[in-house]
């Protein structure tokens, strides 16, 4: 994969960039990034509400049979179910609530580690599957909400499908640190082949 980064616009506080990933002469991925410096503001509020769940030590680890069918990269993380459903459990509510942490993120930029963690949970609509079936991300956008790295090693992740119809699911994702701060918010559209 060859990457071609480009600055699209650079202002005093914000830089907009695009990156194309090309493989065998064909576009494989196109990403857009916006980097912003923190700024003083008279307007400050936070209406986000962290789900009420037990602490990580009180939550069960991911069962071994679920770990066996998870993608290989998931072996680099620890997951503990804090609420919601398990993937492919035939649940009515398309919501995952898991405490997650890296097995080893030594030497990795904390913001890069956070993005990897945010991509860990499967699409929330998979909670409603009664048997395994393919899924494919169509879009994924996220905002890192603080200019400083998140605190702690455990992060509470919530993924909830807002709507699923005609072969696609639209979901929201939240990641909370140990200080109960919302540190990442995302939205994803997913193609469902079930």
Predicted regions and their residues:
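Terminal targeting signals and extreme-terminal segments of soluble enzymes
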Residues: 1-194
